[in-house]
């Protein structure tokens, strides 16, 4: 199966009141993409998610490691590079582009 490179982007914001910075995880389908500590206050970050995969639908999901201490917001999922769109369910849909020879 031929794979395509796609760069998905979304805006991420985490809010917490006190204590250590919260940690969050990002998954593509059910595969862990990254786990990070959120160290910024009052700031959205653009998170770039590289995907090298075959045609299909890919769900990008964020979760807090300890959800009782913070809230996470993810907005504006979009495709920056590659043959993909965001479908009606909010998933990245990779397609095979037509090749001219």
Q: Which residues does each PLM region occupy?
A:
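Beta-strand-rich recognition domains
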Residues: 1-28, 34, 47, 53-101
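A generic structural motif
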Residues: 35, 39-40
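Aromatic sugar-binding surface patches on proteins
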Residues: 41-48
């Amino acid at each position: 199966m031929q794979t395509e490179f796609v760069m998905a982007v979304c805006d991420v914001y985490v809010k917490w009141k006190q204590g250590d910075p919260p940690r969050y995880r990002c998954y593509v389908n059910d595969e862990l993409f990254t786990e990070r500590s959120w160290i910024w206050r009052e700031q959205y970050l653009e998170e770039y998610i590289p995907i090298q995969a075959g045609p299909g639908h890919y769900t990008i999901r964020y979760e807090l490691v300890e959800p009782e201490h913070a809230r996470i917001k993810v907005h504006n999922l979009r495709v920056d590079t590659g043959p993909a769109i965001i479908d009606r369910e909010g998933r990245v849909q990779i397609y095979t582009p037509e090749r001219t020879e």
